[in-house]
């Protein structure tokens, strides 16, 4: 976690404990809208959980604060919910994790034009000038860390396939950093396809790769849900001993495999859905304390290995 974010987290904690009931919000009702994708896979399920937890904490601490959490099944559905949040709910701030980057950029711009404070989480908009605050994991770092691991473990040469997420800014950041990281090596990228951060699509895409490529040394799945689908495809094809898989996110099932030294999933990379809770809390503190929280706040994405996996394994976690 970078120093600026550490300071911000401290401010959030102090804001919740010391400003609650202080009268800082006595003059007006503050309504924060939170727009997130529906829980269509494990990571977004974690996002919904941490958003609801932040809502409970903040509404208990600040009696004049209301947090409205809405989910969307797609980009167009999310755009429609934004209209309702502004027109019917009359929000003063929007915390949004866009379903996709490009289709949500103009709808969020329209919300901004109404004087609403904009916090963007994770999947960036295509126009960063719209946002007041951006909170995300280190997406270029994920790609860079994964690339270094692949180069080191493969000894600088081998055949790999890549399963991407959705066509979003953060997916491009991860992928571009990964490709840059393997440049100069003899690692050959056989193919790359979108798997929509979904285990079922990960299964289908990997089935296609297995059919077309008789030899694969390793798989970068980029996401733990996708990785689960990939592993299922490998087992069904009886090729699970031929290659290893690296996902990302820090899902407890993936971390447990790393902890157990599963050869098929030797490492993982953290990208926690709890960042949504941080984004909501920081946005709230902006209103109740007047603290300047504009800017970009990037959460580190460390490599999980068998040596440090116990630090990241939480059996009771929803993700």
Whereabouts are the PLM-identified features?
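A residue-level marker of the well-folded mature domains of exported/periplasmic proteins
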Residues: 4, 26-319
């Amino acid at each position: 976690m970078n120093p600026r974010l550490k300071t911000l987290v401290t401010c959030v904690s102090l804001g919740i404990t010391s400003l609650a009931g202080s009268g800082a919000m006595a003059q007006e009702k503050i309504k924060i809208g939170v727009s997130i994708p529906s829980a269509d896979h494990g990571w977004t399920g974690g996002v919904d959980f941490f958003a609801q937890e932040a809502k409970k904490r903040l509404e208990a601490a600040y009696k004049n604060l209301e947090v409205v959490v809405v989910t969307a099944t797609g980009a167009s559905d999310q755009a429609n919910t934004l209209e309702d949040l502004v027109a019917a709910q009359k929000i003063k701030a929007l915390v949004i994790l866009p379903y996709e980057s490009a289709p949500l950029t103009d709808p969020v711009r329209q919300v901004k034009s109404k004087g609403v404070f904009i916090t963007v989480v994770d999947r960036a908009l295509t126009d960063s000038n719209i946002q007041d605050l951006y909170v995300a994991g280190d997406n270029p770092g994920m790609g860079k860390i994964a690339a270094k691991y692949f180069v080191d473990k493969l000894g600088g040469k081998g055949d790999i396939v890549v399963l991407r997420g959705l066509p979003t800014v953060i997916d491009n950041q991860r992928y571009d950093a990964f490709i840059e990281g393997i440049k100069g090596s003899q690692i050959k990228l056989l193919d790359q396809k979108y798997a929509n951060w979904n285990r079922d699509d990960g299964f289908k895409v990997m089935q296609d790769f297995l059919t077309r490529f008789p030899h694969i040394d390793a798989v970068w799945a980029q996401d733990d849900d996708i990785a689960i689908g990939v592993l299922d495809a490998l087992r069904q094809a009886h090729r699970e001993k031929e290659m290893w898989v690296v996902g990302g996110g820090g899902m407890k099932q993936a971390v447990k495999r790393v902890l157990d030294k599963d050869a098929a999933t030797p490492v993982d990379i953290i990208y926690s859905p709890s960042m949504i809770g941080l984004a909501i809390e920081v946005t709230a503190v902006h209103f109740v304390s007047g603290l300047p929280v504009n800017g970009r706040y990037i959460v580190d994405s460390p490599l999980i290995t068998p040596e440090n996996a116990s630090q990241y394994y939480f059996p009771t976690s929803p993700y």
